[in-house]
């Protein structure tokens, strides 16, 4: 080991899956052919890393998880051989599988080694048999019986094999007979290495107390004379050893605590010491060149040691194959400022079309009518094209005016913006009665005019954006209830209706919230995201919400994309079939996520799974096999329909169709193992137990089946199911009442919770999904009366039960149904709030192994938040998508879709106690989506800060950062900040108003039409400069500084409250602000580089703290534009929290009468 040897690289061992946690490396080895370092983990995966930077090269699942960890890796010119307890696997260095060997007597393999024949290896373990394998053919060529349990093998002059009793056997390379045996250590051998004529071992022995400890000696043996040599002393405990590949008598000896010693076996006094920065070492390996040393430790990391001046794994390595670099197309300088004459024009001899006069342009015909998407499932092939039954949505000989449809607007006109209503309010005071009448008529239109007409409340709803953003949109026009709707303009928001249905099933809601409160931190856990969403919908109390985080997790699943469940894949797929496929995917993923945390619990199966078995019988040989047939979602299977007898034939009742669908019996062609050929087989399902929640897919793929649903009262609101002797009996209506009166045993009553339906109104062209839900079932108050509500994205309104369960309209198609056992009615369980797992708040969590900043101190158990604990919050965001703006012919602009932001940094500070103002959360969030703008001027985030490979900050996934805030919210903390409404919306979390203190509203003057920025308030109150703008593009805001300033402003406001001088302070602040333009004066008389003052709220307001003023429209307008703000700062303070006044920790120096210090001093 040369003098400049040091740690060159440190990388975490990759997680076994995309949403798993890092795991330890069970074995590491340097490739003797290429510049690669290989590592195996406990899940059967082997991964290679290239070069001194340990760049990830390949990763392969070589062994099933059930086979156990990877225990050894060997290298051959043709590939890499790995060994697990039950199998041996060979791959190429690019990751292609060559062969896989498993044998019934391979029960506990531990080691392998090359034999005298270079194309053969021998594998052994703690079992009675050893196997010889031909590498070229990938087959077992010989099986040898042995009386020893071998744990390690090294090939040299002999095949040195270590046993589990602490002995070492020298085996002959020809017949593998024991030539010599030594008792090397008392209990077990931990590591050994053999090279040339020397063998060195490290192991454990039993001392006085009876527990094995590491021997302080490394034993040395001469393989030429088969005799022991003097041992090498190593007082730290010799746990691992490797012989130098070039210096024949030099070896590396290491302890479990990371002490490294390079010693000459022939001269033990010549030693070289190093200390590796590890907590507990698990293994070492040295490269064939002797220039690099690899260490794996218990903290799931791999360390590479060597000389910075020269590091090569091999003397002569083969070139590593990499993927070909895709050539980029030539760059074209194209921008809005590029003149068209730079492109050039071809030579022409005739007049161009663009020069034709207008009187020569004619309309040659209307565009063809688009194919009705509801017809797609019913298409049948013909000699030319396809045909389908006529849906009869138009009258005979009636055609569509397709040219008018392309420009037709939605029948449901969006309401006026809040700012527009505020401006008109003062002008319309004298015409109040007229306005009231208009509003009443608008409400009447929303509820429709006739029973057979498509009601306006079923129309598509779209969010309109003004220059004041989404807060200016009047959501209360669409929702006057206490139940919150979900916003659109989010990818895959077509699932909103299904999410609402799942939320109102009490047992599913309880399952999701209890899981979210557990230890789960898997990044793409849908069950956790459902718990967060359901909690947010309950806390919103009628305010609009969005399922951004859940839908982002849903979009990240490769299975969802492969199955065509994402929005971009729905162009040729009907919404009804898509939502039923999404329903199956959600339920299967919920079950998977639940078992990740509670693998042995059957709580989910009891709630959601139909426990059944499937018997498959061959019709030819009568051979029958039985396999599990559990299902989470059942599809309705309809018999051959005779619509004339549908009303009288009991077989067409919903209950009988449901029974036949649950215990279905079908015939099909399948493979028979007994006949060894495809035969006609019968598949029959036997049900053993029904779930408490019965979720059904309507599966309406036939127009005739659609007529069943049009029968009034065909869908029952309650059903009864009895499972007895493997048979299912289902009842409804009068039959059910008779069964209840007779007190039939094992009868389970189910109530219809709700359903998802597709709305396809031809006049609006665009089909969408809504849900009808009986909200009384999930009510906390016991009530027997049904209360049905329509959830059409963010439009929520109460409807009659008959309207919800009526399907005689051709544009209303049922998709998903949900029944729940009546015993679970009103079963809303909030016990999860008492079992919150708060471990995440008290320990550091890092994705990139980054060291926590010195200014951050993690919470201690003594500082556990309690209800009323104040914390200061500030966040930073980056732009993922720019706003979509429609420029009209008159030059005006309309925001079609706002810019999409991603959470980049979260800082939370203590709001009280001896460490008041000290952050305990300061996390940067890794973002996998493309970032179009880091907005460094406002966020302080620079390129590379959110990349795990280059970031110097503490990086965490969005799930971890979100869960920390969610835990603080449900622990009852009070969030203090500036512009919190914007932050909470972008974080996608709902915080009740009694848990927020927003300094933007504390320092709001009722008579002024302006909200002050945090930057100006810091100067006005404390005479301090923050968020200073600079010409340096890499300088930006600091969220810790902003959160601390908001906390100080709140503490100072409390002092003003106690002194009773709030109004005087606000008057002085606004008077001084008017003189200065509501921005701090230049520092030391030198003007700083400032952008234009914020005099109007714009959609590009990237910082929630520099909030410009509301429009100058008078007091009524201001009140409407700030509907979420309290009437006065005193009311805001009293409504937020009442704490003791500041102890002066944050008191500024102060030079004026009202600014800079406490007025009480």
From Swiss-Prot:
<dbReference type="Pfam" id="PF20770">
    <property type="entry name" value="PAN2_N"/>
</dbReference>
<feature type="binding site">
    <location>
        <position position="1042"/>
    </location>
    <ligand>
        <name>a divalent metal cation</name>
    </ligand>
</feature>
<comment type="similarity">
    <text>Belongs to the peptidase C19 family. PAN2 subfamily.</text>
</comment>
<dbReference type="GO" id="GO:0031251">
    <property type="term" value="C:PAN complex"/>
</dbReference>
<feature type="domain" description="USP">
    <location>
        <begin position="453"/>
        <end position="822"/>
    </location>
</feature>
<dbReference type="InterPro" id="IPR038765">
    <property type="entry name" value="Papain-like_cys_pep_sf"/>
</dbReference>
<keyword id="KW-0963">Cytoplasm</keyword>
<dbReference type="InterPro" id="IPR028881">
    <property type="entry name" value="PAN2_UCH_dom"/>
</dbReference>
<dbReference type="InterPro" id="IPR036397">
    <property type="entry name" value="RNaseH_sf"/>
</dbReference>
<dbReference type="Pfam" id="PF13423">
    <property type="entry name" value="UCH_1"/>
</dbReference>
<dbReference type="InterPro" id="IPR030843">
    <property type="entry name" value="PAN2"/>
</dbReference>
<dbReference type="GO" id="GO:0006397">
    <property type="term" value="P:mRNA processing"/>
</dbReference>
<comment type="function">
    <text>Catalytic subunit of the poly(A)-nuclease (PAN) deadenylation complex, one of two cytoplasmic mRNA deadenylases involved in mRNA turnover. PAN specifically shortens poly(A) tails of RNA and the activity is stimulated by poly(A)-binding protein pab1. PAN deadenylation is followed by rapid degradation of the shortened mRNA tails by the CCR4-NOT complex. Deadenylated mRNAs are then degraded by two alternative mechanisms, namely exosome-mediated 3'-5' exonucleolytic degradation, or deadenylation-dependent mRNA decaping and subsequent 5'-3' exonucleolytic degradation by xrn1.</text>
</comment>
<keyword id="KW-0677">Repeat</keyword>
<feature type="compositionally biased region" description="Low complexity">
    <location>
        <begin position="1116"/>
        <end position="1129"/>
    </location>
</feature>
<keyword id="KW-0853">WD repeat</keyword>
<dbReference type="InterPro" id="IPR048841">
    <property type="entry name" value="PAN2_N"/>
</dbReference>
<dbReference type="GO" id="GO:0003676">
    <property type="term" value="F:nucleic acid binding"/>
</dbReference>
<dbReference type="Pfam" id="PF00929">
    <property type="entry name" value="RNase_T"/>
</dbReference>
<feature type="repeat" description="WD 1">
    <location>
        <begin position="20"/>
        <end position="59"/>
    </location>
</feature>
<keyword id="KW-0540">Nuclease</keyword>
<feature type="binding site">
    <location>
        <position position="983"/>
    </location>
    <ligand>
        <name>a divalent metal cation</name>
    </ligand>
</feature>
<protein>
    <recommendedName>
        <fullName>PAN2-PAN3 deadenylation complex catalytic subunit pan2</fullName>
        <ecNumber>3.1.13.4</ecNumber>
    </recommendedName>
</protein>
<feature type="repeat" description="WD 2">
    <location>
        <begin position="102"/>
        <end position="145"/>
    </location>
</feature>
<dbReference type="GO" id="GO:0046872">
    <property type="term" value="F:metal ion binding"/>
</dbReference>
<dbReference type="InterPro" id="IPR050785">
    <property type="entry name" value="PAN2-PAN3_catalytic_subunit"/>
</dbReference>
<comment type="subunit">
    <text>Forms a heterotrimer with an asymmetric homodimer of the regulatory subunit pan3 to form the poly(A)-nuclease (PAN) deadenylation complex.</text>
</comment>
<feature type="domain" description="Exonuclease">
    <location>
        <begin position="871"/>
        <end position="1049"/>
    </location>
</feature>
<keyword id="KW-0479">Metal-binding</keyword>
<dbReference type="InterPro" id="IPR012337">
    <property type="entry name" value="RNaseH-like_sf"/>
</dbReference>
<feature type="repeat" description="WD 3">
    <location>
        <begin position="276"/>
        <end position="315"/>
    </location>
</feature>
<keyword id="KW-0507">mRNA processing</keyword>
<feature type="compositionally biased region" description="Gly residues">
    <location>
        <begin position="1145"/>
        <end position="1155"/>
    </location>
</feature>
<feature type="binding site">
    <location>
        <position position="874"/>
    </location>
    <ligand>
        <name>a divalent metal cation</name>
    </ligand>
</feature>
<keyword id="KW-0378">Hydrolase</keyword>
<dbReference type="InterPro" id="IPR028889">
    <property type="entry name" value="USP_dom"/>
</dbReference>
<dbReference type="GO" id="GO:0000932">
    <property type="term" value="C:P-body"/>
</dbReference>
<dbReference type="InterPro" id="IPR015943">
    <property type="entry name" value="WD40/YVTN_repeat-like_dom_sf"/>
</dbReference>
<dbReference type="InterPro" id="IPR036322">
    <property type="entry name" value="WD40_repeat_dom_sf"/>
</dbReference>
<dbReference type="GO" id="GO:0004535">
    <property type="term" value="F:poly(A)-specific ribonuclease activity"/>
</dbReference>
<dbReference type="InterPro" id="IPR013520">
    <property type="entry name" value="Exonuclease_RNaseT/DNA_pol3"/>
</dbReference>
<feature type="binding site">
    <location>
        <position position="876"/>
    </location>
    <ligand>
        <name>a divalent metal cation</name>
    </ligand>
</feature>
């Amino acid at each position: 080991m040369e003098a400049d040897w040091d740690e060159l690289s440190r990388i975490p061992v990759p997680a076994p899956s995309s949403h798993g946690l890092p795991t330890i490396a069970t074995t590491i080895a340097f490739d003797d052919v290429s510049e690669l370092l290989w590592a195996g983990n406990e899940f059967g995966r082997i991964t290679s890393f290239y070069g001194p930077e340990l760049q990830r090269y390949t990763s392969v699942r070589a062994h099933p998880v059930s086979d156990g960890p990877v225990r050894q890796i060997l290298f051959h010119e043709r590939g890499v051989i790995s060994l697990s307890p039950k199998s041996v696997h060979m791959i190429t260095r690019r990751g292609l599988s060559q062969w896989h060997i498993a044998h019934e007597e391979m029960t506990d393999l531990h080691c392998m080694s090359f034999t005298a024949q270079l194309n053969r290896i021998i594998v052994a373990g703690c079992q009675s048999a050893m196997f010889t394998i031909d590498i070229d053919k990938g087959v077992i060529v010989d099986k040898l019986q042995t009386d020893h349990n071998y744990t390690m093998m090294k090939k040299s002059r002999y095949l040195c094999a270590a046993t589990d009793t602490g002995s070492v056997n020298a085996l002959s390379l020809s017949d593998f007979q024991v030539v010599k045996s030594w008792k090397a250590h008392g209990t077990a051998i931990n590591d050994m290495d053999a090279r040339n004529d020397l063998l060195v071992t490290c192991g454990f022995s039993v001392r006085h107390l009876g527990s094995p400890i590491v021997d302080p000696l490394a034993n040395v043996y001469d393989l030429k004379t088969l005799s022991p040599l003097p041992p090498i002393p190593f007082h730290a405990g010799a746990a691992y050893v490797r012989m130098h590949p070039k210096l024949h008598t030099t070896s590396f000896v290491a302890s479990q605590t990371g002490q490294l010693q390079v010693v000459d076996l022939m001269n033990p006094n010549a030693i070289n010491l190093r200390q590796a920065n590890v907590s507990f070492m698990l293994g070492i390996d040295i490269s064939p060149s002797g220039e690099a040393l690899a260490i794996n430790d218990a903290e799931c990391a791999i360390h590479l040691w060597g000389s910075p001046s020269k590091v090569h794994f091999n003397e002569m390595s083969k070139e590593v194959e990499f993927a070909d670099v895709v050539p980029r197309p030539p760059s074209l300088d194209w921008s809005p400022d590029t003149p068209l004459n730079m492109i050039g024009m071809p030579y022409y001899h005739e007049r161009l079309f663009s020069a034709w006069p207008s009187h020569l342009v004619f309309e040659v015909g209307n565009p063809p009518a688009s194919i009705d998407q509801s017809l797609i499932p019913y298409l049948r092939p013909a000699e030319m094209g396809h045909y389908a039954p006529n849906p009869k949505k138009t009258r005979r000989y009636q055609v569509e005016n397709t040219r008018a449809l392309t420009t037709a607007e939605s029948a449901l006109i969006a309401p006026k913006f809040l700012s527009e209503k505020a401006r008109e309010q003062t002008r319309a005071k004298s015409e109040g009665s007229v306005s009231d009448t208009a509003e009443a008529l608008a409400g009447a239109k929303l509820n429709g005019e006739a029973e057979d007409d498509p009601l306006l409340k079923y129309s598509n709803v779209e969010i309109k954006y003004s220059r004041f953003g989404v807060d200016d949109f009047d959501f209360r026009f669409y929702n006057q209830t206490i139940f919150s709707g979900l916003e659109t303009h989010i990818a895959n928001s077509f699932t909103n209706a299904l999410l609402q249905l799942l939320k109102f099933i009490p047992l599913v809601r309880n399952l999701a919230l209890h899981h979210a409160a557990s230890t789960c931190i898997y990044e793409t856990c849908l069950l956790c995201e459902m718990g967060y969403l359901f909690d947010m919908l309950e806390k919103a109390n009628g305010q609009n919400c969005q399922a951004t985080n859940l839908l982002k997790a849903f979009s990240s699943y490769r299975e969802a994309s492969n199955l065509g469940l994402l929005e971009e894949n729905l162009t040729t797929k009907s919404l009804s079939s898509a939502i039923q496929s999404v329903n199956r995917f959600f339920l299967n993923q919920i079950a998977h996520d639940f078992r990740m945390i509670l693998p042995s619990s059957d709580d989910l199966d009891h709630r959601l799974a139909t426990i059944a078995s499937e018997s498959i019988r061959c019709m030819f040989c009568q051979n029958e096999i039985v396999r599990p047939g559990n299902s989470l979602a059942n599809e309705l299977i309809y018999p051959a329909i005779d619509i004339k007898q549908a009303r009288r034939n009991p077989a067409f009742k919903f209950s009988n169709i449901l029974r036949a669908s649950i215990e279905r019996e079908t015939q099909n062609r399948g493979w028979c193992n007994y006949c060894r050929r495809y035969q006609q087989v019968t598949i029959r399902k036997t049900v053993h137990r029904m779930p408490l929640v019965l979720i059904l897919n309507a599966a309406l793929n036939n127009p005739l089946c659609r007529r069943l649903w049009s029968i009034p009262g065909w869908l029952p609101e309650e059903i009864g199911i009895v499972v007895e002797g493997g048979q299912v009996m289902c009842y409804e209506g009068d039959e059910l009442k008779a069964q209840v009166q007779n007190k039939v045993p094992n009868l389970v009553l189910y109530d219809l919770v709700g359903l998802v339906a597709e709305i396809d109104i031809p006049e609006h062209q665009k089909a969408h999904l809504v849900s009808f839900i009986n909200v009384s079932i999930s009510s906390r108050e016991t009530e027997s009366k049904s209360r049905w509500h329509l959830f059409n994205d963010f439009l929520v309104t109460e409807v009659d039960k008959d309207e919800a369960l009526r399907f005689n309209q051709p544009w209303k198609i049922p998709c998903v149904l949900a029944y729940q056992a009546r015993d679970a009615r009103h079963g809303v369980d909030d016990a999860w709030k008492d079992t919150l797992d708060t471990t995440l708040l008290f320990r550091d969590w890092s994705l990139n192994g980054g060291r926590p900043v010195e200014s951050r101190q993690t919470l201690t158990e003594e500082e556990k938040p309690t209800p009323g604990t104040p914390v200061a919050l500030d966040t930073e965001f980056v732009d993922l998508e720019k706003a979509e703006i429609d420029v009209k012919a008159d030059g005006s602009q309309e925001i079609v879709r706002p810019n999409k932001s991603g959470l980049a940094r979260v800082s939370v500070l203590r709001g009280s106690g001896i460490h008041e103002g000290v952050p305990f959360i300061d996390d940067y969030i890794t973002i996998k989506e493309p970032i179009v703008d880091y907005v460094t001027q406002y966020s302080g985030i620079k390129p590379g800060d959110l990349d795990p490979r280059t970031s110097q900050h503490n990086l965490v996934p969005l799930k971890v950062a979100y869960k920390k805030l969610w835990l603080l919210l449900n622990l009852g903390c009070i969030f203090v900040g500036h512009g919190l409404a914007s932050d909470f919306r972008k974080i996608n979390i709902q915080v009740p108003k009694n848990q927020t203190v927003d300094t933007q509203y504390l320092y709001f003057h009722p008579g002024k039409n302006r909200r002050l920025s945090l930057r100006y308030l810091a100067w006005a109150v404390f005479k301090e400069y923050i968020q200073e703008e600079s010409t340096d593009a890499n300088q930006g805001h600091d969220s810790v500084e902003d959160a601390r300033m908001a906390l100080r402003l709140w503490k100072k406001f409390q002092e003003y409250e106690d002194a009773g001088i709030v109004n005087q302070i606000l008057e002085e602040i606004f008077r001084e602000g008017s003189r200065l333009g509501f921005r701090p004066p230049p520092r030391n008389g030198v003007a700083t580089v400032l952008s234009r003052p914020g005099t109007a709220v714009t959609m590009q307001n990237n910082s929630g703290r520099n909030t410009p003023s509301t429009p100058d429209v008078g007091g009524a307008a201001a009140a409407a534009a700030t509907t979420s703000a309290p009437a006065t700062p005193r009311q805001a303070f009293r409504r937020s929290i009442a704490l003791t006044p500041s102890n002066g920790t944050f008191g500024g120096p102060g030079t004026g009468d009202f600014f800079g210090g406490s007025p009480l001093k």
